[in-house]
UniProtKB/Swiss-Prot annotation:
Range of residues in the leader sequence: none
Region G2, residue ranges: 41-45
Pfam family, one: KH_2
Lineage of the species this protein comes from: Bacteria, Pseudomonadati, Thermodesulfobacteriota, Desulfovibrionia, Desulfovibrionales
Subcellular location: Cytoplasm; Cell inner membrane
Binding site for GTP: 15-22, 62-66, 130-133
Originating organism: Nitratidesulfovibrio vulgaris (strain ATCC 29579 / DSM 644 / CCUG 34227 / NCIMB 8303 / VKM B-1760 / Hildenborough) (Desulfovibrio vulgaris)
The KH type-2 domain, residue ranges: 212-290
Name the UniProt record assigns to this protein: GTPase Era
Length: 308
């Protein structure tokens, strides 16, 4: 009697900032495990999402965008991305097709740290050219696809839309086929290895970014200071602190008469309740901590620093 082969392995999602890696991860898992904003470089940790099927379990690692910026926080983000890449059985390189079709000269700049490592890879590599939903005339993508195929001849290059889930079935067939044979590493109902407190903090941070968009710089972090589950009540009490680097940033987050932080709290509470499947009492506070993006000890306390 033949038994169906079960496969299990790790996949790293890498690429420049704002390519859509977190949107892709959520689309592949079928649930929200990574925050999604319109601002680049919002993924700071290695976000792990788990897809379980009868024939396979794939553990996806969403990583901070690979870029060449300076500063201790940015160097830490880059280190996290490379660590995930080294641990994977296969790689997905995510690129913003819309950006590089409109501005092809930016491609060399944005993928410079990836060109040689990907060309030398012996593991399977899939290059996903994302955001094809923005183009009615698909022939406009051909020059970019041909350029990438010539750059990385061993990789599988194809267009997709993480937002509309176009190409996801094809991507999953490829990825599952690349995974080594083996039993599942996690229970089939587990979709992430992240603690719920961390995911809660990420939801709050997502709402801050989306609410303030271009006005707020990246020097924002969220820490859960209190987490209390009341016995006999289907409710969780959460107190979260939003850290900013300047007093002027604090005013932005709070807003006139507290209007902005109230809206952030309402939107965050909704998503947290969906995550926990419980009622949530959420209190948000804003504190100034100048220079925190260069304070390695503080970043470690927030769980932002990778193992060294």
């Amino acid at each position: 009697m033949n038994q169906t082969t079960h496969r299990c392995g790790w996949v790293a999602l890498i690429g420049p900032p704002n390519a859509g890696k977190s949107t892709l991860l959520n689309a592949l898992i079928g649930q929200k495990v990574a925050i999604v904003t319109s601002k680049p470089q919002t993924t700071r940790n290695q976000i792990v999402g788990i897809l379980s099927r009868k024939d396979a379990q794939v553990v996806f690692m969403d990583t901070p965008g690979i870029h060449q910026l300076r500063g201790r926080l940015n160097k830490m983000l880059l280190q996290t991305a490379w660590q995930s890449m080294n641990a994977a059985d296969a790689l997905i390189v995510m690129l913003d097709g819309d950006l590089y079709i409109r501005k092809p000269d930016l491609l060399d700049r944005d993928i410079a740290p990836l060109v040689e490592p990907i060309a030398a890879e012996t593991r399977p590599v899939v290059v996903v050219v994302n955001k094809i939903d923005l183009f009615r005339d698909k022939s406009k993508m051909l020059p970019l696809l041909e350029r990438l195929s010539a750059m990385w001849p061993k990789a599988e290059v194809f267009p997709a839309s993480a937002l509309n889930k176009d190409g996801m079935d094809h991507l999953l067939r490829l990825i599952v086929g690349y995974m080594p044979e083996g039993p599942a590493l996690y229970p089939e109902d587990q979709i992430s290895t992240l603690p719920v407190r961390f995911m809660t903090a990420e939801i709050v941070r997502e709402k801050v970014f989306n609410k303030l968009r271009q006005e707020l710089p990246y020097s924002t972090a969220v820490d859960i200071e209190q987490w209390e589950e009341e016995e006999g009540r289907d409710q969780v009490i959460v107190n979260a602190v939003i850290y900013v680097a300047r007093p002027s940033h604090k005013s932005m987050v709070i807003g006139k008469g507290g209007a902005t932080i109230k809206e952030i709290g309402i939107e965050a509470r909704k998503d947290i309740q969906e995550l926990l499947e419980k009622r949530v009492h959420l209190e948000l506070w804003v504190k100034v901590r100048e220079g925190w993006t260069e304070d390695l000890g503080f970043m470690r306390s927030l769980g932002l620093s990778p193992d060294e």
